[in-house]
């Protein structure tokens, strides 16, 4: 027993003290995914969407890896993300803020060399005013709404914007862009509708480069590329197109420790509300991850984890900090206190978990909690 404790202490010293879940991020696989997209897109440039802390994987580490692969265009959602990322990248890397700026952030943004994506006349006026105050031309990107009804200049604002550009401006437009709402569905009619609307916008605003394709858009064909694509989920190993074979390499794996095992008789109630009742004598394991760690509560009695390739179904409700699984299929003693089970990895993909949870891989990936020890290789 004492030797086991000493081994445990040594192992703890080499990883993270107190962690009971280990999120492995394969930066080499990330680089290979980027190179694959670059090869598909050439000669079109490939940027990288690193918003939400690079989908939960660590924006600084991810961005530096992609920079080393030649990426120079990085997209975040909020200005605060750009502020955090800026010191991690060389000055020739451009950081774009997709949501644009809230009033009062314009001067700081300009002084840090961060580029806002302007989505409305209100944002345009604020950025133009900042340029006047600083007495210099400031760069920006214009985003247009082509049918998603979320962000971007609406149709009714385009005429006034075009007039402002014709009259001369202290804002340098680097390119114009829009976002595809249904690119993950290659057969969606909305893809063609948005393409047609973007073509009309290009006619109204001639002479500007275009950025259009997201991860799914890369696989819709060259017509959707523009001069700069903006892949996100595909970089991190997620499937860019629903229902199609995933061409990307997995980047993330997650293993979680067992806290306790037990054997219960038939008729035992498991978890909050006694929602699961065993039909036979059952061996159970409680693992150290719950909905606070990114295992959605809707996986209750639906999802699973794996141990050496054996599927271990979740039984009862997922709790905040723990989840109980049925280990009866394993030989007795195969899984014990401290053993690690696979939540995400070789036997279970992001898409598998998302399907069981009734959601999308983006939500699963970005929801992986900060109690995991993130290990990079």
Swiss-Prot record:
Catalytic activity: L-alanine = D-alanine
UniProtKB keywords: Isomerase, Plasmid, Pyridoxal phosphate
Tagged with keyword Magnesium: no
Cofactor requirements of the protein: pyridoxal 5'-phosphate
Single GO cellular component term: cytosol
UniProt key word Membrane: no
Record-listed substrate binding positions: 150, 320
GO molecular function, one term: pyridoxal phosphate binding
Pfam families registered for this protein in UniProt: Ala_racemase_C (PF00842), Ala_racemase_N (PF01168)
First-tier enzyme category under EC: isomerase
Gene Ontology biological process terms in this record: D-alanine biosynthetic process
Residue(s) carrying N6-(pyridoxal phosphate)lysine: 51
Catalytic center residues: 51 (proton acceptor), 272 (proton acceptor)
EC number of this enzyme: 5.1.1.1
Membership in a protein family: Belongs to the alanine racemase family.
Job description of the protein: Isomerizes L-alanine to D-alanine which is then oxidized to pyruvate by DadA.
Protein name, per record: Alanine racemase, catabolic
Organism: Rhizobium johnstonii (strain DSM 114642 / LMG 32736 / 3841) (Rhizobium leguminosarum bv. viciae)
């Amino acid at each position: 027993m004492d030797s086991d404790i000493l081994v445990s202490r040594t192992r703890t010293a080499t990883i993270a003290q107190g962690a009971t879940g280990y999120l492995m991020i394969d930066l080499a696989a990330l680089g290979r995914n980027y190179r694959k997209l670059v090869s598909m897109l050439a000669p079109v440039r490939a940027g990288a969407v690193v918003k939400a802390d690079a989908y939960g994987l660590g924006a600084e580490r991810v961005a530096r890896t992609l920079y080393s692969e030649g990426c120079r265009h990085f997209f975040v959602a909020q200005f605060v993300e750009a502020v955090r990322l800026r010191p991690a990248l060389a000055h020739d890397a451009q950081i774009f803020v997709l949501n644009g700026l809230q009033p009062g952030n314009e001067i700081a943004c300009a002084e840090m060399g961060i580029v806002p994506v302007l989505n409305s006349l209100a944002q345009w006026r604020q950025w133009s005013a900042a340029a006047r105050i600083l007495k210099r031309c400031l760069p920006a990107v214009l985003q247009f709404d082509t049918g998603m009804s979320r962000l971007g200049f609406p149709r009714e604002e385009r005429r006034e914007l075009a007039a402002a550009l014709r009259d001369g401006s202290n804002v340098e437009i680097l390119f114009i862009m829009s976002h595809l709402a249904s690119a993950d569905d290659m057969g969606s009619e909305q893809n063609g509708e948005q393409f047609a609307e973007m073509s009309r916008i290009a006619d109204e605003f001639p002479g500007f480069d275009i950025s259009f394709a997201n991860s799914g858009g890369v696989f819709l064909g060259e017509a959707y590329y523009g001069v700069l694509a903006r892949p996100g989920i595909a970089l991190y190993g997620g499937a860019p197109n629903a229902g199609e074979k995933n061409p990307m390499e997995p980047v993330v794996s997650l293993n979680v420790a067992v806290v306790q095992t037990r054997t219960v008789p038939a008729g035992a109630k498991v978890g909050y509300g006694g929602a699961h009742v065993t039909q036979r004598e059952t061996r159970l394991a409680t693992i150290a991850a719950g909905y606070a760690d990114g295992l959605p509560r809707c996986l209750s009695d639906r999802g699973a984890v794996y141990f050496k390739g054996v599927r271990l179904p979740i039984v009862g409700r997922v709790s905040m900090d723990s989840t109980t699984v049925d280990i009866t299929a394993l030989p007795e003693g195969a899984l014990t206190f401290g053993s690690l089970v696979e939540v995400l990895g070789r036997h279970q993909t992001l898409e598998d978990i998302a399907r069981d949870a009734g959601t999308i891989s983006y939500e699963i990936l970005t929801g992986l909690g900060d109690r995991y020890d993130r290990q990079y290789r």
